[in-house]
């Protein structure tokens, strides 16, 4: 069992990559809630790191945070984004974090395909948890949650 990256490390990893790829500023805004409810969110996307133990990377955003993320990744105005762009952006964010986490603590794991949570499920049986709330873009008020959870007995 490896120690999960801290919320601050998750934010730093996302910031380094997003600055290089999209010119998008990401800052740490605190820890996000434990668990991954899909309710009251515009979109919640997960990417598994398949192996033992099983890790799940999760990104979620409300309308404002999702639009800011999509705007940065697609180089357009926030009002020109749509639900598909938001989901694509969250999938990309999950893949970015999954690749970084794999290199940090799960080199033998395989990165699974991103998928969207379409109901109000909460991930249960979490052994370890680390989650960061990120401020996205230059406005300072758009937020996206990114988290990693470790599960025992899977993989």
Feature-to-residue mapping (PLM):
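N-terminal auxiliary interaction/assembly segments of multi-subunit proteins
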Residues: 1-155
């Amino acid at each position: 069992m490896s120690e999960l990256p801290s919320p601050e490390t998750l934010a730093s990893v996302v910031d380094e990559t997003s600055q290089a790829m999209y010119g998008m500023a990401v800052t740490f805004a605190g820890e996000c809630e434990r668990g991954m409810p899909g309710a009251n969110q515009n979109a919640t996307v997960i990417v598994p790191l398949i192996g033992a133990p099983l890790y799940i990377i999760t990104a979620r955003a409300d309308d404002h945070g999702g639009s800011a993320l999509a705007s940065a990744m697609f180089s357009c105005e926030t009002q020109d984004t749509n639900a598909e762009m938001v989901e694509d952006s969250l999938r990309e964010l999950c893949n970015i974090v999954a690749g970084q986490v794999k290199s940090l603590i799960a080199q033998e794991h395989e990165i699974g395909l991103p998928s969207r949570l379409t109901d109000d499920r909460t991930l249960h049986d979490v052994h370890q948890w680390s989650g960061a709330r990120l401020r996205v873009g230059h406005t300072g008020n758009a937020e996206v949650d990114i988290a990693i959870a470790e599960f025992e007995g899977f993989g």
